[in-house]
Amino acid sequence: YGTEVHLEIENWIKDGTDPKDIKSIVAAQWIGAYISKPNIETFPEVIVYSKELGIAGTIDILMMDKKSGEYVLIDWKASKRIDKSSFNGKKGIKKESCTIDDCKYNHYALQLSLYRYILEKYYGIQVARQLVAQLKDDRVETHSMPYMKNEIITMLDSFN
């Protein structure tokens, strides 16, 4: 389901194809408020990678403020809930994650933090914010995610 929504949003941004799914329509209305600003450039479905790290991923939306040169990462999520704490206090199972609550909020924060780390280190792109845009039937709920840079570096170091 999420893949269809992503595709509809991408097609709307790239060529103006009207979305059909209710969550895609709500997302298009929300993102449209930003796209219409003359100083904002929007890039959907941006692939980032690092040969050195052997890692690649796809950023749902990368926005650039042409005045400041800063970027914002946006990741669409169709989850009903984004829990900020884990069930029964469960933590990560590796030594690098054993202090991090095992919950969707942290999973998403780590995902966006990895993308941000790759953009900043390997592409020289300055990221100002990273957001999860949670798609509801009637609105988009935004979650400003922390940059977990130290955790990402620790995890990446454990693989090398």
What do the predicted segments below correspond to?
Residues 43, 72-75, 129-132:
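A structural signal for short, well-ordered beta-strand segments and their strand-loop junctions
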Residues 49, 78-81, 137-138:
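Short, solvent-exposed loop/turn segments at secondary-structure junctions
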Residues 54-56, 69-71, 140-142:
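Short, mixed charged/polar active-site loops
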